């Protein structure tokens, strides 16, 4: 008589690691970094566990500085590059600082967003109850990508 087959799905342990080596490697890497950051900052203040919140904070910095810089920006193809030079030379109070902050906060925002996406994927936080949050995050990633392309095109250099 054949043995009864296991009807319980295997979702964890060594079997899952064998089926998904990339996800297991990514999760091990994120967990290792979590350990180091927990030791340095404590579990509650670990910035590695707060990637989404930090990205959201940077989004608002990018939005505020973008509005400020856009107010002094010439959107025509002929005047765009010269207006960036004028903004950098402090046409308005702190406009050069605002432009630099906008640029570097945008880069950090993209980096933290991608790291947050990878961390959530590695920890399987995209299924069941969290599916809606995952899908809206992926849609927002597309919006961020298109906004970034638009921001680079505005300079016309």
What does each model-identified segment do?
Residues 1-157:
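Membrane-embedded alpha-helical bundles that constitute the cytochrome b-like, heme-associated redox core
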